[in-house]
Amino acid sequence: MPKENSRVATIGGLALAVTGLAHFVAPQLFEGLTESAFPTDTRRHVYIDGGIETAVGLGLAAPQTRKFAVAAMIGYLLYMAGNVVRNR
């Protein structure tokens, strides 16, 4: 079973990394989502979010960095949620 969990984490991490890269390829797709957290200079934040998601995704994909990546992902989600609440 742990091997299956590792495979799921690897695939999920790679999927997150691909989504992060998509922020650079088609940033307009993410502007609507990002605008609620960052209403000013939204495009810049789309790129920053893409970089963070790519890094966290790659971290999740590698077993050696998975624990750190989970902590980073939790911090990132709290940061985003805080910005959404603050900019309501």
Regions found by a protein language model. Give the residues of each.
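Short amphipathic, positively biased membrane-proximal segments
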Residues: 1-88
